């Protein structure tokens, strides 16, 4: 079944009844004691639920077998900060430009491998799906912010390439999360930022449910 396709059944194909989030983007965000659903959508028109599946769980279960059978929509959203941190670029200077680029390329390759498998999961499930780019950081140190932005651009290029190849639509968080109030820390979103992402993502899911089959960019 084609990704971004609309499955039969239910009162309306574009009603989000069960959203499955593939990725760890909400893992380190402090949303308080409220249910995640209430933070993302404070006053929903229809009852809905959220299932978060981090990449290791999806890969261990074998792609779409990890996705609940009653899922209606999928969002793919990964915190790429771990990969950028793992590259070591933000912690110490590189001996050479070529060495820094090679280290970054290796980290991006690892990231893309995981990301591609999450896309395969969504395509196999055949549910309306949107993909989120990585969130920009807000490091106070200008040099650190520039390095992070450069690394982020390479990772986002991998996301866009995989998404376009799979004909999945993209929520570009670089344009969504563009205010200081969207961030709780240098690298983590605030509740307000999370809610902005949820609003754009929800609109994107509604549209790809009604008009599947081609890549669009939302922000």
Residue spans for each PLM region:
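Conserved catalytic region of serine esterases and O-acyltransferases that act on ester linkages
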Residues: 2-3, 14, 62-63, 70, ...
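Alpha-helical cap/lid subdomain in secreted, periplasmic
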Residues: 41, 61-191, 195
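Solvent-exposed, well-ordered amphipathic alpha-helical segments
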Residues: 1, 9-20, 117-130, 166-169, ...
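Serine-esterase "nucleophile elbow" of acetyl-processing enzymes
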Residues: 1-59, 64-69
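Short flexible/disordered coil segments
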Residues: 9-11, 22, 44-49, 53, ...
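Intrinsic structural disorder
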Residues: 1-4, 38-39, 151, 172, ...
